[in-house]
Amino acid sequence: MINHIKNTLFLTICFLAFQSSNLFAQKGLFSRQKVVNQYATVGIGGGSSHYFGDLAPYSYAYYGLYTNVRWNGSMNYTRFLTPNAAARVSFSYARLAGDDYNFSQKNLEKMAGNYLRNLHFRNDLQEFTLSGLFNILPQYGKGAKGRSAMMPYVAIGVGLYGHNPKARAAADFTGPNGELEKQPWTSLKPLRTSGQGLPGYSTKPYSLVQPVMPIAIGIRLKINQNFDFTAEAGFRLTPFDYLDDVGSGEYPAKSLLASVGGNQSADFSYRAGETYSALKLTNRGAQYKQAAETHAKVQVSPTIAPSNNPESIYPYSSSRGSKRIDSYILTQFTISYVLSNNIKCPPIR
């Protein structure tokens, strides 16, 4: 699967290079006779962020459109090279999140194992992309003044993002008056929760910088001569399985994790035994019996609880995650200012 995505990224780069060569091959694209079609915009916007992966399975992707949704902010510079094609440089800061406890309750019958697993994460991404924008409908007007009142478009590009997945430790009664309290966010990569880089594991520690391929569709509306409004939804392909810090394979042995990263590594790796949701602070016992019976396919004791021998229901031999890569969707609503609003007439020779 990862090789397939790498091939897709390579083909995308080739496609962009081909499209760019076509644009530059047009006679005198930057000649005085052609600049009449060119102008630039700068934009700022924001929207929602949607994660898909081990904690939001693709088989239930529709839940991910409204569950554990977070936010993003963006800035961009766009240069319209022809009436129907543009190049855009964008920077986005996006927060992604996933939570087994919250997501699995959308369909506990089908996601009982996820409920028992009880993992969660938060990841703040700093994404830099270069994209080509192509109008879906033809535009015949020239320059900024000739742009259409409404124009649907598609975008495809390549880029990089920095990231750092984090999670909270188990909720504890550490409040000022002894009340249940959320714990601070902790970076997960150093803890090697899926066995990355541990003796006997082939998986190497992952990088905090990864490639990304944005594929988007949007609509651009002309507010007036100086401003545009853009609504865009973009799917991000990335050959990476650790946006959520959850890899494939069985849980690493508790003793092995503890020998490398101490008890903290083991505690963040296997979380089926936590009584309370680390994010919601609610007791997991209410649905635990149902999830345990569904997952184990046997009747369990009425007094069963997460803290009562959880390994008998969700053993360390369980798969911590799948081999499928992670991805995300960004919706972005942008206000753009037109930098060049005058048609530049070439000199008569």
Where are these regions (language model features)?
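Residues that define the transmembrane beta-barrel architecture of outer-membrane proteins
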Residues: 38, 67-71, 124-128, 148-150, ...
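Outer-membrane beta-barrel "beta-signal"
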Residues: 133, 324-349
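Residues on the lipid-exposed face of transmembrane beta-strands in outer-membrane beta-barrel proteins
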Residues: 44-48, 75-79, 130-136, 156-160, ...
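Extracellular loop and loop/strand-boundary signature of outer-membrane beta-barrel proteins
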Residues: 29-30, 58-64, 113-121, 141-142, ...
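Surface-exposed strand-loop-strand hairpins of Gram-negative outer-membrane beta-barrel proteins
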Residues: 47-76
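Gram-negative (and chloroplast) outer-membrane scaffold detector with strong preference
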Residues: 83-85, 91-186
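Flexible glycine-rich, low-complexity coil/linker segments exposed to the extracellular/periplasmic environment
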Residues: 177-201, 254-325
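Repeated loop/turn-to-beta-strand initiation elements of outer-membrane beta-barrel proteins
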Residues: 52, 84-87, 139-142, 226-229, ...
